[in-house]
Amino acid sequence: MAVYKLFPDKDTYIFTEVSIANAGYDEMIEIGGYPVVGIGQAARILLHFKDTEIANVVDNKIGNTNFSASINLKLASAYETPTSHSVHAYPIYEYWDGGVGKYGDEPYDKSGCTWRYAGAQNSNSWTLPHNTVTMPVNITGSYNSTHLGGGNWYTGSNGYDLHTSQSFELNDNIDLNIDVTNGVLLHYTGSITNNGFILKLDDAYEFNTTSSIRHKYYSSDTNTIYPPTLDIKWD
């Protein structure tokens, strides 16, 4: 089986802890659910891979659409991993700015998307059920009255199920290798706009107040040999 690896042109993570701060240039990207002063928080990963690079692989390397695709992330550190959990992936509905911020920047960096906003400089609130009279078909997000925002995503399109997940048990290797074949296929065909993918924990573990589940992965800005990749495979 042949494998071609693509690297993100932008990646970040959005987090409720500072819902208007960007982390688009951080060396780590994080998913999690954890408390801060008793208030549940969440973190989600966003990645984008260029249309032109996907098309080049499909058109010039494979020559057809008989391929699989997965997002590969290498774990840097994990805290309070539960006995079992899943990570979920969806194609993102809305355009977002990557930014050049880092977690912990003072003052907060606003050069890219955040938990609350899709655009730079805290512009363009994410389109979500709480601020939109009628959400587009097959588009959703999550609602938390304490933390408005968190991105939006496709659940399906053109008969394709666009939700995928990877499940883990205690003591498993929790590097991510999560299938996104249908999403990449619809990006390639233009059936949905390519705004990348969002990765998140199970709903039950986000906004956690009883444990601190935090999984940090190397980002495209890492100085290691473990940046994220989109692995496209074919026979």
Give short role names for the model-derived ranges.
Residues M1-D235:
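Secreted, disulfide-rich extracellular signaling modules
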